[in-house]
Amino acid sequence: MLLGVNIDHIATLREARKINEPDPLEAVFLAKRAGAFQITIHLREDRRHIHDYDVERIVESSFLPVNVECSTDKQIVDLLCELRPHRITLVPEKREEVTTEGGLDLLGRFEILKSRIAQFRENDIAVSLFVDPDITSIELSKELGADMVELHTGTFANLHLMLRSNLPKTPHAIPALEMDRRSLSLAYRESLLTLQKAAQKANTLGIEVAAGHGLNYQNVSEIVKIPEIIELNIGHSLIARSIFTGFEAAVREMVELLGRGD
């Protein structure tokens, strides 16, 4: 299974002081040396971490494929069509959110998504859609002409945290998931089954499958067992681990974990 390294939070650290370091571009070369498959960055409308010049420099300099996550915002879409990264992943976006909270509303935004996908295709850019892991979303992704879907693993990841970590004992416990362990265990197994079914459906329709959101060193072992998923995009847990082990070592460790699913 391939690893896409999301380096947004290197830029988050830079923006905390609003200076010029750490430089996300430096991480691109370290990720390659550690065995990563691609670089993933999110150019948000509010530019809270990655900026336009970051995208330009990374696309121009990276020896690895670059996957840029973005909304359907016209200014951003036009810019990315000029820069031409390897792939675009269209994601939903709310300015008030801490991180992406769910998959795209494919039905409600069908026409704008179709238009943006066509524009990227005209510029020879592959398109992935960040979707909730349900059959309807997969079928709509096929109808829209997506090359790939990235399955939102947030529910699975949150259940894993509440079931198998100390999160329930911290101020960041998830209120909606405060339930007994038996209920958590059942919901956890159901979330895995949902991901498996969505991946299988996409595979039968000829759509490549990636996954991401909330994945870490503790929970990826379950995801690598799903053979239809060929790529994971992981950021926060890698950057968090790198504080203690170094960035290159953190990436290499994750690459090794994903390799166990081959």
Curated annotation (Swiss-Prot):
This is Pyridoxine 5'-phosphate synthase. GO terms for biological process: pyridoxine biosynthetic process. Its EC number is 2.6.99.2. It catalyses: 3-amino-2-oxopropyl phosphate + 1-deoxy-D-xylulose 5-phosphate = pyridoxine 5'-phosphate + phosphate + 2 H2O + H(+). Keywords: Cytoplasm, Pyridoxine biosynthesis, Transferase. Homooctamer; tetramer of dimers. Catalyzes the complicated ring closure reaction between the two acyclic compounds 1-deoxy-D-xylulose-5-phosphate (DXP) and 3-amino-2-oxopropyl phosphate (1-amino-acetone-3-phosphate or AAP) to form pyridoxine 5'-phosphate (PNP) and inorganic phosphate. Pathway: Cofactor biosynthesis; pyridoxine 5'-phosphate biosynthesis; pyridoxine 5'-phosphate from D-erythrose 4-phosphate: step 5/5. 3-amino-2-oxopropyl phosphate binds at N6, R17, G214, G235, H236. It is found in: Cytoplasm. PANTHER family: PYRIDOXINE 5'-PHOSPHATE SYNTHASE (PTHR30456:SF0). Its main location: cytoplasm.
